[in-house]
Amino acid sequence: MTRKTIIVGVSGASCSGKSTLCQLLHAIFEGSSLVHEDDFYKTDAEIPVKNGIADWDCQESLNLDAFLENLHYIRDHGVLPTHLRNRENKNVAPEALIEYADIIKEFKAPAIPTLEQHLVFVDGFMMYVNEDLINAFDIRLMLVTDFDTLKRRREARTGYITLEGFWQDPPHYFENYVWPGYVHGHSHLFVNGDVTGKLLDKRIQLSPSSKMSVRDNVQWAINSILNALQ
């Protein structure tokens, strides 16, 4: 019997912890799949340039049409397309799985029930920016944002591997590009456009606090998923 596929979005601003959370959920829920929106970045030459600087943190830096097509493929076929299966674990940071091995052990079956559904976890920073994308997910999780924490985490990163090279943020990149890009893509989801405030869109579940530990985020996400599947 073919299991029903449930697509679970895990979104949030850059450095909100969404990728770590997605990796841990993938490790906890046996038989699940993992998709990274980052795999849909455009080539380096296609990244929009604003004020002479490449803007990797705007919607236009991603091929969202291809991303949506792949989500529809997963919905229709119940499996990841070959090119995503081949990349499924390439963006996984093994150090995170080692660092949080105790959390995986705590929540892994039999601590949680074995599900009849095939869960596909999708992590990305621009996943709820329009209705077509929002509707592509069955469960929509979002990590709450905190400007100062995100800025500190982003500026602590050494850089990013791109399709064709390596990118390192220039000074003041977070406040001039990363944060404005996130606000532009998500303000429509929040009361008065305040992305640090309350959600207007009840289809999306927002984590209770930006101060939650990794374990608390995992607990919240698992509870949200299991409740949605009831």
Swiss-Prot record:
Residues at the catalytic site: 38
Binding site for substrate: 38-41, 56-57, 154, 159-160
Pathway(s) per entry: Cofactor biosynthesis; NAD(+) biosynthesis
Annotated disulfide bonds: none
GO BP terms in the entry: NAD biosynthetic process; nicotinamide riboside metabolic process
Gene Ontology CC: one annotated term: nucleus
Record's protein name: Nicotinamide riboside kinase
Gene (name only): nrk1
